[in-house]
């Protein structure tokens, strides 16, 4: 094995990322060295690349970015037993402390001291990445690497959608970014009676339709509340999966929900949000759920079962672009345009 590798690095505060030749990571006794075969771009990566206020307050350069990964194990620490050389793996990117009360209660996704791969530690937009053994997930080898790499964000969709019963329910998904779009086939496979997808981006709406959405709603052209009620016998949606973080979409989702509906909130608003809690939530008996990350490891087992039941094949259209590390600027520009599904970086792909 060579001693160096190519990696996309955030070298200093400010926009952009630099492709550098750096040493291949060394691993400790409980670490795993993974040769990265595919790494999909997440909204978090875009925030770090563009260097928004959140990134400026959280990320400490220099740092190799990227966290949604799939690859092959090429070396393991002497105490590692969870995987072996040659295994195909992905990673749970939340590195938890195992010491706080939430970890002690088995709520690892709510760890008080979480560190994130590619945000707080060197990440996966590189030819190799070192991952703690406790974060390794061994994949079925018949799943393409690009679909293995999107399991982490898919876990967010699964956690949000399956945090309550969907059987025979009407479901409204507000926000058709990749996670919102992933929620469409998840809800369908979970037995939803009808799945309605809402976004102002026509490209993303059509992609949601390709993945199985029954109704596509563009709130700039239609009244979403009226549309939802027209498909739900005038009552409103049984379940709202809020994936956008957009204040207007959140309010529309609440108004489009039936009395007593479940509202699962994953999208992060960029500013404080004003709601009429009395009229829109309390008096209507809505059940609001804040969703963060994936349950460790319950959600990963759910994803595996769904993949084996056919979800992997259904998600193929979501991966719209495959690009080499050298094209990170073009990849981020494309992501910012909103005219893509999931963009996957492939280190072995030639520019």
From Swiss-Prot:
Active site: 44, 47
Location(s) in or outside the cell: Cytoplasm
Residues the record marks as site: Important for catalytic activity for the proton relay mechanism but does not participate directly in the coordination of zinc atom: 152
Residues where Zn(2+) 1 binds: 42, 67-68
Record protein name field: L-threonine 3-dehydrogenase
Keyword Cytoplasm found: yes
Keyword NAD (UniProt): yes
Binding locations of Zn(2+) 2: 97, 100, 103, 111
Quaternary structure and partners: Homotetramer.
Catalytic activity: L-threonine + NAD(+) = (2S)-2-amino-3-oxobutanoate + NADH + H(+)
Broad class of enzyme this protein falls into: oxidoreductase
Single GO cellular component term: cytoplasm
Stated family: Belongs to the zinc-containing alcohol dehydrogenase family.
Xref: CDD domains: TDH (cd05281)
Source species, domain of life: Bacteria
Any single biological process term in GO: L-threonine catabolic process to glycine
Pathway: Amino-acid degradation; L-threonine degradation via oxydo-reductase pathway; glycine from L-threonine: step 1/2
Predominant location category: cytoplasm
GO MF annotations in UniProt: L-threonine 3-dehydrogenase activity; zinc ion binding
Obligatory cofactor(s): Zn(2+)
Positions of NAD(+) binding: 179, 199, 204, 266-268, 291-292
SUPFAM superfamilies membership: GroES-like (SSF50129), NAD(P)-binding Rossmann-fold domains (SSF51735)
């Amino acid at each position: 094995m060579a001693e160096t590798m190519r990696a996309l690095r955030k070298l200093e505060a400010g926009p952009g990322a630099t492709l550098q030749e750096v040493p291949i990571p060394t691993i400790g006794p409980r670490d795993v060295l993974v040769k990265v075969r595919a790494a999909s771009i997440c909204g978090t990566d875009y925030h770090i690349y563009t260097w928004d206020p959140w990134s400026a307050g959280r990320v400490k350069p220099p740092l190799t970015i990227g966290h949604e990964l799939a690859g092959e194990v090429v070396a393991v620490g002497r105490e590692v037993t969870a995987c072996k050389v040659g295994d195909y793996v992905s990673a749970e990117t939340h590195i938890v402390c195992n010491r706080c009360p939430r970890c002690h209660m088995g709520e690892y996704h709510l760890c008080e001291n979480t560190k994130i791969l590619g945000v707080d530690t060197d990440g996966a937009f590189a030819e190799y990445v070192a991952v703690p053994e406790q974060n390794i997930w061994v994949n079925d080898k018949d799943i393409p690497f690009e679909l293995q790499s999107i399991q982490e964000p898919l876990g967010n969709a699964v956690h949000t959608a399956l945090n309550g019963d969907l059987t025979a329910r009407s479901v409204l998904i507000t926000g058709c970014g990749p996670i919102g779009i992933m929620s469409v086939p998840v809800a369908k496979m979970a037995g939803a009676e009808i799945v309605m997808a809402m976004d102002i981006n026509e490209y993303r709406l059509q992609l949601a339709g390709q993945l199985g959405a029954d109704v596509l709603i563009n709130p700039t052209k239609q009244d979403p509340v009226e549309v939802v009620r027209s498909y739900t016998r005038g009552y409103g949606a049984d379940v709202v999966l809020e994936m956008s973080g957009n204040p207007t979409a959140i309010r529309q989702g609440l108004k489009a929900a039936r009395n007593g509906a479940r509202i699962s909130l994953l999208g992060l608003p960029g500013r404080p949000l004003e709601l009429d809690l009395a009229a829109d939530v309390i008096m209507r008996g809505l059940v609001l759920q804040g969703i963060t990350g994936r349950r460790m490891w319950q959600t990963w087992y759910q994803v595996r079962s769904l993949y084996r039941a056919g979800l992997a094949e259904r998600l193929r259209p979501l991966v719209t672009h495959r690009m080499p590390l050298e094209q990170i600027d073009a990849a981020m520009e494309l992501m910012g345009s909103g005219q893509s599904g999931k963009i996957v970086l492939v280190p072995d792909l030639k520019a």
